[in-house]
Amino acid sequence: MAKVLFSLFSFLFLIIGVSAQFQFFEQMFNGQQQQHQRQPQDVPSDSQWYQDNYDRAHCTSYLCPGTLSCVAFPHHCPCAHPTYEEKFELADGNAICISKGGFKAGEAARKVELARKGLI
């Protein structure tokens, strides 16, 4: 009788152990598939995404092509990455965004002005 109970308990523990291993592998592999399904898709490499957003943007003044911001004048357009770029207004009423490049505030604009004058 003790031998039968021992065999029965051994078999039961074996079944529980195998079941736990299969659940582990099922969770591990199915969990990765579900995780991949939840990731957003990359935007397409053509310009259609930009063109669609540009066409849907409503602006009664000037729509900035780089940021799709609506401003009164083209030189009011913000830089797309203000943390890394500094806006510099040119004499002809246009504006450009230039990399700060680790310079202190105003330094990038000063370098553009020096280059415009042919000094650097």
From Swiss-Prot:
This is Long chronological lifespan protein 2. InterPro entries: LCL2 (IPR034543). The keyword Transport does not apply. Keywords: Signal. The keyword Signal applies. Probable component of the endoplasmic reticulum-associated degradation (ERAD) pathway. Residues 1-20 form the signal peptide. It comes from the Eukaryota. GO terms for biological process: ERAD pathway. It comes from Botryotinia fuckeliana (strain B05.10). Belongs to the LCL2 family.
